Amino acid sequence: MKFIDEAIIKVQAGAGGHGCLSFRREKFIPFGGPDGGDGGNGGSIYLIADKNINTLVDFRHQHHFRARRGENGRGRLQTGKSSEDIYIPVPLGTEAWEAETGELLGDLTRPGQTLLVAKGGAHGLGNARFKSSTNRAPRKTTQGKPGEERTLRLELKLLADVGLLGLPNAGKSTFIRQVSAATPKVADYPFTTLHPHLGVVRIDSNRSFVAADIPGLIEGAAQGAGLGVRFLKHLSRTRLLLHFVDVAPLEPTLSPVDSVRAIHRELQQFSPELAAQEQWLVFNKTDLISSSERASRCQEIIREICWQKPVYEISALTGEGCQRLIHAVMQYLEEVSPYEKEDSQ
């Protein structure tokens, strides 16, 4: 299925039904009192989070949603039937924005969570409502109110615990294939990952975390170059970033130190908050160099960039070091509350 993470839709709630103007007409009662009933309420429109959906692609085909109006009231004090509400399923992690004002209406992060995006119009009142001691035969009624109408911008931000960062061909997709059941495309050319992939990494039967692999970043990504910038927003909900560094690049001109610095610059320009997030270095493709060269090369990179946070050496292809890394990630996630990041902002 094609991955779509933004959509524009129009929602129009139903209008309320009108109140009825009616008087009792029965045998031997020529001047019966008012018996006009109220109208029904118009249907409202809700978004509902569905864990079985992972893209907004369906809105490419249907982008206008309209609820029915309530029925008008009838004589004999019969109330018009209210219209049924409409529930539009969206993926977990969907934000709903008012397109014209830019107002955030809500963020759907829990299965079954609902968000009212267009309220149905209130019903009109029948003339029976206006009977009083001084007005025995009121001819007054009210009309139903119109329903709300909005243009919404839906934006999907994937829900993941861990985000994978790095230049194209740093080995992120190979890693996520190694430690999870996800199957992103892997090849020896840039941009084999064209959209985000989620992988569930299971430590044991009771412990797991979700990792997000996004397309690799390149110099100038924050200004729109390459593919990764469009998907950086999917890392905003993560609690840990794993920065993958190719310690044995195919091109000798590609310096691992320059690669690390380039990624940090792009993160800082895109979002200072994202750049300040907890981040670990993962030196990948260590199977391509000798043990002695591996140690010296990794130490040189750490020294050059003055890195003081955790560092891991792995080979995503052979699996060397991967179990140690994912167990450390699991331990970190268990120690850090999911709400700690939100509280600090």
UniProtKB/Swiss-Prot annotation:
Residues covered by region (Disordered) = 127-148
Task: State where Mg(2+) binds.
Answer: 173, 193
Q: Where is the composition biased (Polar residues)?
A: 130-144
Any one cellular-component term (Gene Ontology): cytoplasm
One BP term from GO: ribosome biogenesis
The Obg domain sits at 1-159
Q: A single Gene Ontology molecular function, please? A: GTPase activity
Q: What is its main location?
A: cytoplasm
InterPro entries attached to this UniProt entry = G_OBG, GTP-bd, GTP-bd_Obg/CgtA, GTP1-OBG_CS, GTP1_OBG_dom, GTP1_OBG_dom_sf, OBG_GTPase, P-loop_NTPase
Cofactor requirements of the protein: Mg(2+)
* Cellular compartments annotated: Cytoplasm
Listed EC numbers = 3.6.5.-
Could you tell me the keywords of this UniProt record?
Answer: Cytoplasm, GTP-binding, Hydrolase, Magnesium, Metal-binding, Nucleotide-binding
Q: Which family does it belong to?
A: Belongs to the TRAFAC class OBG-HflX-like GTPase superfamily. OBG GTPase family.
Q: Which HAMAP family match?
A: GTPase_Obg
Complex formation: Monomer.
**Primary role:** An essential GTPase which binds GTP, GDP and possibly (p)ppGpp with moderate affinity, with high nucleotide exchange rates and a fairly low GTP hydrolysis rate. Plays a role in control of the cell cycle, stress response, ribosome biogenesis and in those bacteria that undergo differentiation, in morphogenesis control.
Q: Which PANTHER family match?
A: DEVELOPMENTALLY REGULATED GTP-BINDING PROTEIN-RELATED, MITOCHONDRIAL RIBOSOME-ASSOCIATED GTPASE 2
User: What is the name of the protein in this document?
Assistant: GTPase Obg
Q: Which organism is it from?
A: Nitrosococcus oceani (strain ATCC 19707 / BCRC 17464 / JCM 30415 / NCIMB 11848 / C-107)
Query: What is the organism lineage in this UniProt record?
Result: Bacteria, Pseudomonadati, Pseudomonadota, Gammaproteobacteria, Chromatiales
